[in-house]
Amino acid sequence: MLKDLFSKKKKYATIPSEQAKQDVPEGIMTKCPKCKKIMYTKELVKNLRVCISCGYHHPMSAPERIGCLLDEGTFQEYDRHLLSKNPLEFPQYMEKIEEDREKTKLNEAVVTGEGTINGFPVVIAVMDSRFRMGSMGSVVGEKIARAIERAMEKSVPFIIFTASGGARMQEGVLSLMQMAKTSAALKLFSEQGGLIISVMTHPTTGGVSASFASLGDYNFAEPGALIGFAGRRVIEQTVREELPDDFQTAEFLLKHGQLDAVIPRHELKDTLTNVLDIHQSRGGDEWHTN
């Protein structure tokens, strides 16, 4: 009996059942990746997907961003009918495209169109990282180039919101061509006096960061956005140096003169309105960057 009294008792861990795991429906709550706070998704969306605890800027979908920036009922979408093909016959590429179309209810990784911001007419392009990580394929480049051309025709400012992992590898050189095509369209627009505003959001990397994302008359970014061409690990291995902790963040780029401002999401519409107001000519119909 004494032996039983001093013997170690076995410890057991309780494993939650599948039913217990499903008690909280998916999508009801969102955990902040920065401060780890768990909040109601509905409250997060109401706060423009900015964490109410630490201010972390969660990604926004293209429809959400358009909805919070443009005046209600003014948005008219361009080129929704343009769809990606598979020119290189890359295995399972079209299956993945179809999956993203079903998941996001979008046809491609960018939404373009026209509308007004506090009464100021603009042409806008908004990338959506949910669709193939916002990668730039031939349709993405074509939609952006066409949007720039429409901004030229209408003599209104062009605003682009970037969120991309870079060029779309499944389309090879056709994807890389979009860097030149979009950059050339922006150059022509700029030569005609057009106003270009670029807003880089998390993440803006690869061929997108090396082309149209960095060619604005104003280059803005959201707080904490990852912005860069090559990955941090690749750069460290190449230069054989340890990089700063904040390397490739919006704040790092601002500090080193590569951005004009880092603007919190709640202040973005007012900032864009002020910029548009400054650049509108006295006549009210023309825009200029001079």
From Swiss-Prot:
Pfam families: Carboxyl_trans, Zn_ribbon_ACC. Keywords: ATP-binding, Cytoplasm, Fatty acid biosynthesis, Fatty acid metabolism, Lipid biosynthesis, Lipid metabolism, Metal-binding, Nucleotide-binding, Transferase, Zinc, Zinc-finger. Residues 28-290 form the CoA carboxyltransferase N-terminal domain. Disulfide bonds: none annotated. Pathway: Lipid metabolism; malonyl-CoA biosynthesis; malonyl-CoA from acetyl-CoA: step 1/1. It catalyses: N(6)-carboxybiotinyl-L-lysyl-[protein] + acetyl-CoA = N(6)-biotinyl-L-lysyl-[protein] + malonyl-CoA. Component of the acetyl coenzyme A carboxylase (ACC) complex. Biotin carboxylase (BC) catalyzes the carboxylation of biotin on its carrier protein (BCCP) and then the CO(2) group is transferred by the transcarboxylase to acetyl-CoA to form malonyl-CoA. Its EC number is 2.1.3.15. GO terms for molecular function: acetyl-CoA carboxylase activity; ATP binding; carboxyl- or carbamoyltransferase activity; zinc ion binding. Zn(2+) binds at C32, C35, C51, C54. Its cofactor is Zn(2+). It comes from Anoxybacillus flavithermus (strain DSM 21510 / WK1). It is found in: Cytoplasm. HAMAP family: AcetylCoA_CT_beta (MF_01395). A zinc finger (C4-type) spans 32-54. The keyword Methyltransferase does not apply. This is Acetyl-coenzyme A carboxylase carboxyl transferase subunit beta. One of its GO terms (biological process) is fatty acid biosynthetic process. Binds 1 zinc ion per subunit. GO terms for cellular component: acetyl-CoA carboxylase complex.
